[in-house]
From Swiss-Prot:
Expressed in roots. Detected in stems. It comes from Arabidopsis thaliana. It holds the Pfam family NmrA. Keywords: NADP, Oxidoreductase. Forms homodimers. GO terms for cellular component: plasmodesma. Belongs to the NmrA-type oxidoreductase family. Isoflavone reductase subfamily. GO terms for biological process: lignan biosynthetic process. PANTHER family: PINORESINOL REDUCTASE 1-RELATED, PINORESINOL REDUCTASE-RELATED. The active site is at K144. One of its GO terms (molecular function) is pinoresinol reductase activity. This is Pinoresinol reductase 2. CDD domains: PCBER_SDR_a. Disruption phenotype: No significant difference in lariciresinol content. Prr1 and prr2 double mutants show a complete inhibition of lariciresinol biosynthesis.
Length: 317
């Protein structure tokens, strides 16, 4: 098993382990050798796919721990069994938005008193740099900062993983709206298409999470995930696809003003996501700052052979 600096096994509890990223984090923690626990919440009810997923984790050696956000003591009992807690609660507005519920997790960790480190659900844009974000999407960053402030107030050691767009949502579709597949003939280009964006495969984000959670170099730090070969402009991403398919797409250039005007007609939940999109593709919020005194995942863990976007896109050809 993976050892901590204190010569103990690293016991990790993953909260949100049946979600798209959470299930990958569970698998990565098991592969890394961590003694892995997964919170089994009664809210899954008779969701057979989630039940079967939990049982598959158990077969691989994970421990299932019962706990509910409506039962504080059950959460305290769950976190008392581990050294590290990783949250992968969804922050997607148009599906489920569970960021605020992590306050209950913070309270449980504080009361338990034994958790050496907490990794809250972040993974995307650094909320500490998004004070200028437009509403209603700003709510996500406000809530993530509320979680961070609660962590600080409780004196809980932590690591924040941030800084990239998940390839499943932003890469395979060449950053197009309303689809997760590449366009066949036409593609919308945001602005001039030359703003740098960071893409990462979700499996790789999970691997970095599993590696950083007990690394003394990342304690009480922000870890940016910036795979060098995946720091691309949208135009570069499109050109990779055109090279793979040997077909040039018809390009429509969407100005920032037109993009913002189009947002106004959408439902609130979609306005939030599109606002984030604007900050990424027009303002370059993922790449407009240096790492500084914090850390960067690919430099810390060069042994992780991350998936480049040219490799990622091949499955769609």
């Amino acid at each position: 098993m993976k050892e901590t600096n204190f010569g103990e096994k690293t016991r990790v509890l993953v909260v949100g382990g049946t979600g798209s990223l959470g299930r990958r984090i569970v698998s990565a923690c098991l592969a890394e050798g961590h003694e892995t626990y997964v919170l089994q919440r009664p809210e899954i009810g008779v969701d057979i796919e989630k039940v079967q997923l939990l049982l598959s984790f158990k077969r691989l050696g994970a421990h299932l721990v019962e706990g509910s956000f409506s039962d504080h003591q059950s959460l305290v009992s769950a976190v008392k069994q581990v050294d590290v807690v990783v949250s992968a609660m969804s922050g997607v507005h148009f599906r489920t938005h569970n960021i605020p519920v992590q306050l209950k997790l913070v309270a449980a960790i504080k009361e338990a008193g034994n958790v050496k480190r907490f990794l809250p659900s972040e993974f995307g844009m650094d909320p500490s740099r998004m004070g200028h974000a437009m509403p209603p999407g700003s709510e996500t960053f406000d809530q993530k900062m509320e979680i961070r402030n609660a962590i600080k107030a409780a004196g809980i050691s932590h690591t924040y993983l941030v800084g990239a767009c998940f390839a499943a949502y932003f890469g395979g579709n060449l950053s197009q709206m309303g689809t997760l597949f590449p366009p066949k003939n036409k593609v919308d280009i945001y602005g001039d298409g030359n703003v740098k964006v960071v893409f990462v495969d979700e499996d790789d984000m999970a691997k970095y999470t599993a590696k950083t959670l007990n690394d003394p170099r990342t304690l009480n730090k922000t870890v940016y995930v910036r795979p060098t070969d995946n720091i691309l402009t949208q135009m570069e991403l499109v050109q990779i696809w055109e090279k793979l398919t040997e077909k040039e797409l018809e390009k429509t250039y969407v100005s920032g003003n037109d993009f913002l005007a189009d947002i106004e007609d959408k439902e609130i939940s979609h306005q939030a996501g599109l606002g984030h999109f604007y900050h990424i593709y027009y303002e370059g919020c993922l790449t407009d700052h240096e790492v500084g005194d914090d850390e960067e995942a690919t430099k810390l863990y060069p042994d992780v052979k991350y998936k480049r976007m040219d490799e990622y896109l091949k499955i769609f050809v």
